[in-house]
Amino acid sequence: MATRANVPEQVRGAPLVDGLKIQNKNGAVKSRRALGDIGNLVSVPGVQGGKAQPPINRPITRSFRAQLLANAQLERKPINGDNKVPALGPKRQPLAARNPEAQRAVQKKNLVVKQQTKPVEVIETKKEVTKKEVAMSPKNKKVTYSSVLSARSKAACGIVNKPKIIDIDESDKDNHLAAVEYVDDMYSFYKEVEKESQPKMYMHIQTEMNEKMRAILIDWLLEVHIKFELNLETLYLTVNIIDRFLSVKAVPKRELQLVGISALLIASKYEEIWPPQVNDLVYVTDNAYSSRQILVMEKAILGNLEWYLTVPTQYVFLVRFIKASMSDPEMENMVHFLAELGMMHYDTLTFCPSMLAASAVYTARCSLNKSPAWTDTLQFHTGYTESEIMDCSKLLAFLHSRCGESRLRAVYKKYSKAENGGVAMVSPAKSLLSAAADWKKPVSS
């Protein structure tokens, strides 16, 4: 078994030994220089002038190596006549001596590059300019000739006095049942087709009935409507069905009530969830008609109307126009009171349903002293100006002033109750009554 050579231990604090004598397997002593930094490929002394140089952390490229050599040559220059240069290690023939082109390249690379410190740029954050500062700046206060001319042209075209239209559907944008995206198109369509379902003046073809008998029938139907607690849509559709049927077929006097109760049955089936039973309708007629007679008349009405029941009644427009009026409960009750009051009278058939609804809103605003009586929003959504609805509004104001004296008091009793705001007790619009004093009966269209 081979013996291990004893290597003397190095005393702490003693200088490093330049060479170590190591015996190989044959016992021969081999001297070699102690290794320094393994990664130091350049023979640069570890300490120069007693100061330790910082380690090189960047990769040594050709240009960086040339710079290191140049710095080393500058440090080896004699100081105070001392021509001795410290040895950096074993001498090697430089590459530049063997290749003249490489020598010139090294000379170019040996140029000392002085790092120039860039001036520090101070970047100041701009202050946010508020709207008040912009408005108060003197530049914005200057009035140019072009701005004056443009302002005059806008005033001449009426752009300055542009009407203020309130978005009445703003609160219903999240309500999918309101159909806000289509509501304007729907009411434009209603106004186009309302003429098709508008009843014509028919008293000239009725030989056994007159206007007063029609008013008595509708007054009685209003009481039945209240008795069964039906919706307002049912009432307006019932009157529409009666007038349309009477405009195409002459009815004897004894069957007029039968036409009315059958029309109420049709409208209830169309609008109500739980329509009244036929036997209940027979009871309210005091058994004047049988169930079979009501069903036969129902079929006759549907046949003459060609089953056309989806019509824009006055109630369809009332809902929209009341919303455009920004109404309170008192205002809403007053509008319905005037609309139902006008529905009882035959003279209102000369006006289309949308005009009757708009006139009811206008007359109600005048009766409750709302200012202004007709707004830009109402004109936009109704499609009527104040002058266009004036004749119909005068008629409604005239009927309002006479309702307390009439024997047909179903509408008056209904809207005299506290649950409906007692709006029937409100005085009619004086501004419209003065003009309604010389009101003339409308000419049949």
Curated annotation (Swiss-Prot):
Pfam families tied to this protein: Cyclin_C, Cyclin_N
Listed CDD domains: CYCLIN_AtCycB-like_rpt1, CYCLIN_AtCycB-like_rpt2
Induction field: Transiently down-regulated by salt stress in roots.
One Gene Ontology term, aspect cellular component: cytoplasm
Gene Ontology biological process terms, A to Z: cell division; mitotic cell cycle phase transition; response to gamma radiation
Entry keyword set: Cell cycle, Cell division, Cyclin, Mitosis
PROSITE patterns: CYCLINS
Tissues expressed in: Expressed in roots, stems and flowers.
Keyword hit for Ligase: no
Subunit structure: Interacts with FZR2/CCS52A1, FZR1/CCS52A2 and FZR3/CCS52B.
Protein task: May induce mitotic cell division.
Record family assignment: Belongs to the cyclin family. Cyclin AB subfamily.
Name of this chain's protein: Cyclin-B1-2
Species whose genome carries this gene: Arabidopsis thaliana
